[in-house]
């Protein structure tokens, strides 16, 4: 489960959820604005 590459993250997070994270990343209302 602990791979040396960061590509494993894509397989752990669903594409739809990842897209939401990208949207909220630019959302000033989100606490994780630094993400």
UniProtKB/Swiss-Prot annotation:
Enzyme class name: hydrolase
Catalytic activity, EC: 3.2.1.14
GO-annotated biological processes: chitin catabolic process; defense response; polysaccharide catabolic process
Keyword Electron transport applies: no
Annotated keywords: Carbohydrate metabolism, Chitin degradation, Glycosidase, Hydrolase, Plant defense, Polysaccharide degradation
Catalytic reactions on record: Random endo-hydrolysis of N-acetyl-beta-D-glucosaminide (1->4)-beta-linkages in chitin and chitodextrins
Name assigned to this protein: Basic endochitinase CH1
Organism: Castanea sativa (Sweet chestnut)
High-level lineage: Eukaryota, Viridiplantae, Streptophyta, Embryophyta, Tracheophyta
